[in-house]
Amino acid sequence: DRSSAENFPAKLSTEASQPVGSYFANWIMGSAPKELSSATSEDVIIRTTFDPQIQQVVEKSTRKVFEEFVKEDSKAEVAVVVMSKDGLVRAMLGGRDFSGGVDKFNRAVQALRQPGSAFKPFIYAAALDQGYSPNTVFFDEPIEIEIAGSKTYKPKNYTGEYLGPVTLNDALGKSINTVAVKLANEIGIEKIRAIAKDFGIRSSIGKGPAIALGASEVNLLELTAA
């Protein structure tokens, strides 16, 4: 009965608790219906898209990077999501502790980070949706945007250089900050927030011009899926 089931909740099998893919297994269990994860003692088989060979490559490669390039006492962390082009998650790493116990913090799905320029495609997707063309020309130049109740926003290009007239195609390819901000300001922030949501971004997206440069935090899984 239910009372008995609650006293003996579902647990990961021995195989699922092993180091390889444990972050993936924990994510699946955390995503399962509440009745399945906490109110059943029955044996349940859950079929997933996990690929142990890809997972082993991810863990081996990540371990090598940390051994060769990261100091032993460093607090650096890592998160990896491998997704095939059909949108299925094949491997996941939520931290440098590959054992990834049941209660380990999974950075692939729980950590919120600023995506930076990885958010720019949403700006350009919104532009295309509004009738802009890849050949539409914008002027790459220093800009200032007045924000009520705040300091003037003055985005700069990473290179410190300005190229003058550029197409949207080139602006995206060269990751030009000023054009992304201009475009977002012209299209309207709400349209960008809406299209990001349509692509699967569930984290809260800000309402200021800085979202064009990826200032709003998202998690790695939703960004990869988008």
Spell out what each predicted region is.
Residues 81-83, 90-96, 135-141, 169, ...:
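Generic beta-strand/beta-sheet core signal
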Residues 1-20, 37-121, 125, 130-136, ...:
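Periplasmic/cell-envelope proteins involved in peptidoglycan metabolism and beta-lactam response
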Residues 31-39, 203:
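Short, conserved catalytic or adaptor-binding loops enriched in Gly and charged residues
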Residues 39-43, 103-109, 153-155, 163-165, ...:
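Flexible glycine/proline-enriched surface loops and loop-helix/loop-strand junctions
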Residues 8-10, 199-225:
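Active-site-proximal helix/loop microenvironment
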Residues 4, 122, 142, 222-225:
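Ca2+-coordinating acidic residues in Ca2+-binding motifs
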Residues 1, 24, 28, 32, ...:
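Stable alpha-helical elements in mature extracytoplasmic
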Residues 13-20, 24, 30, 132-192:
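Conserved catalytic neighborhood of penicillin-recognizing serine enzymes
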